[in-house]
Amino acid sequence: MVTEMDVKPVRSRDLALIGYDHATATLEVVFRAGGVYRYQQVPETVYHALMSASSHGTHFQKYIKAQYPYVKVS
């Protein structure tokens, strides 16, 4: 269960919004082309690295997409 999501817009060709729920270690990614995904068991350090990356999309593809379990929300 997701509690309170801290959602922020990002400058990325592929990603529109990134949210993180500190209580559940859930990362939510909203794609510009459509689709919302929730990645589970994502450490807070991984979220901070994503948010401070020079390319959010590249960082997401390399370090998160295939590394954590996820569900498609919409």
PLM ranges: what are they?
Residues 2-74:
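Acidic/histidine-enriched, beta-strand-rich ligand/metal-binding domains
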